[in-house]
Amino acid sequence: MGKKKICWITGDAFMDTDQNVVPYLMKYSGMQIDWYQLSDFNSKVPVHPDVTCVFKFKNRGLNPLRILEYIKLFNAIGIRKYDIIYSGFMDVSYFFFVLKFFAGKIFIVHAAHNVIPYSVWSKRLRWYVNTVFKYNHHFQLFSKFTADYFRKKYPTKSMFYAPMAVKSFGEVVTDNYKVDSSKLNLLFFGNVVENKRLDLLIDAIKGLPQEIQNRIHLNICGNCKDAERFIRQIDGCSSISTYFKRIDDCEIAELFTKHDFLMLPYEDVAQSGPHMIAYYYNLPVIASDIEGFAERVIDGENGYLFKRNNLHDLVAVIKKASQLDNVESVSYTHLRAHETSLH
């Protein structure tokens, strides 16, 4: 009997999740895995060296011509020669329907990164996600609380829970961001969207007593479509610096090793990519107490939790962190060991 053949599809948005997992499975699973990376025409996400083939789209996601591109893709890779299709790609238009048609009776395992709708989701995205859950039958969930939610809402579906792995971006190879090592350095990292509550974090920093503000610094690093709004909110506060841009992958290790805490003030999340990067680089977090964080953060051991959307509580936690005699009193050296225990 030959090896099982797996077609593994990863979109740019989930490349940071799969880039450490798929090469490991290729080496140790005993299965033949062909890995396909799907990229937008203007993507800056690098191609992983273990990827079998990269497919760059010429049209935007809602353009009906995307249907023809999906047809071309599935014909080119011979989708029906596989035993299992693992889909780590998400659009809000045609992908699932074309994949379902071409796959026929082949198992499609959908990587369900988000199950419970975020407050910032559009109606189209809500409809599309619900459609995938309704018509597909096999799913992977990445956090315990979303797995429990999924089991209750979709009791007839087949699912398995495999926690999101810690994420490595290699060794430090850049020196582009200057930090004052005499201060407590805080990092907000990733695309800035409404549910991540950067506004709350900025208010918290500005609300600290001046003598504490003088001893801390927040760097905000990531793409932002509404940068001017946050620059106005910061209003010249010298304890906050902004880098509103796409952070190159080669710079990520530098950022996560130069700071003392990763800030995760989100109001809702299933799981967080930056959170898993932080744990790889032994960087503790200050996070809201939503379930997506509470199942991984042990308060005072690998980070601190504060009450969701509570400015007063966030200020208090930042004050607590600023008063540590030795930042390493939060057990950095055990962060990856703690994550390993969850897997």
Spans of model-derived segments:
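Conserved donor-binding/catalytic core segment of Leloir-type glycosyltransferases
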Residues: K178-K196, I202-I205, N219
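Short His-centered aromatic/hydrophobic patch
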Residues: S87-Y94, A112-V115
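Nucleotide-activated donor-binding/catalytic signature segment of Leloir-type glycosyltransferases, i.e.
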Residues: F230-C250
